[in-house]
Design a protein with these regions (language model features):
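DNA-dependent DNA polymerase catalytic subunits
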Residues: 1-189
Length: 189
């Protein structure tokens, strides 16, 4: 039985989304097994297109959060303004806390605090102008989870979390970016 033992790559890190880690592992296994590039491209394109069907929790970024006060620059209405240079995951944690207040459930649910482990996602354009949102992964209010499900930005999650990692493999093999043959052929007709 051939078994792949990987160390040092994002696909095995605990702070990398599960579904994306599984894809990277299968891509790496395919590369090592000399699977043709077009088959690997197909796997990647299929994953990218099916991300909307994957449970958001499997593509959310797990991380620890700290320095929340440092990056809070006061409130503008219901939502916190962020200090320059605030990391996306810190913004996401603060946004979760703001949403607890906005939805009127801050008395029922604990806010995210420094040194907690959270998961977070990028958001598409929404009525509050929020870029990202975190959650605890347990005892989260349905209002926040529904908001995340409605506005999760799958394209940005793919671009920020996965595309660069895939391109590291591809560039080292002198391969071009994965191409969806179906849509690229349709352009000619």
């Amino acid at each position: 039985v051939n078994k792949l033992h990987v160390k040092g790559l994002d696909l095995v890190r605990s702070n990398f989304p599960k579904a994306m880690g599984e894809l990277l592992k299968s891509v790496l296994e395919d590369i090592l097994a000399n699977v043709p590039k077009d088959k690997i491209d197909e796997r990647i394109i299929n994953f990218k297109e099916s991300m909307k069907l994957v449970d958001f929790d499997r593509i959310a970024m797990p991380t620890g959060v700290k320095n929340m006060k440092k990056y809070s620059a006061g409130k503008n209405g219901n939502f916190t303004q962020f200090a320059k240079g605030a990391p996306a995951h810190v913004k996401a944690a603060i946004t979760y806390n703001d949403l607890l207040e906005h939805f009127g459930v801050s008395g029922k649910y604990e806010k995210i605090s420094n040194s907690e482990k959270i998961k977070w996602v990028y958001l598409r354009q929404n009525e509050f102008g929020l870029d990202s949102c975190g959650y605890k992964g347990y005892e989260d209010p349905t209002e926040v989870i529904d908001f995340i499900k409605q506005y999760i930005d799958h394209k940005k999650m793919y671009a920020q979390m996965l595309e660069k990692k895939i391109m590291m493999f591809y560039e080292s093999l002198k391969w071009n970016q994965p191409v969806n043959k179906k849509t690229s052929m349709e352009r000619f007709f």
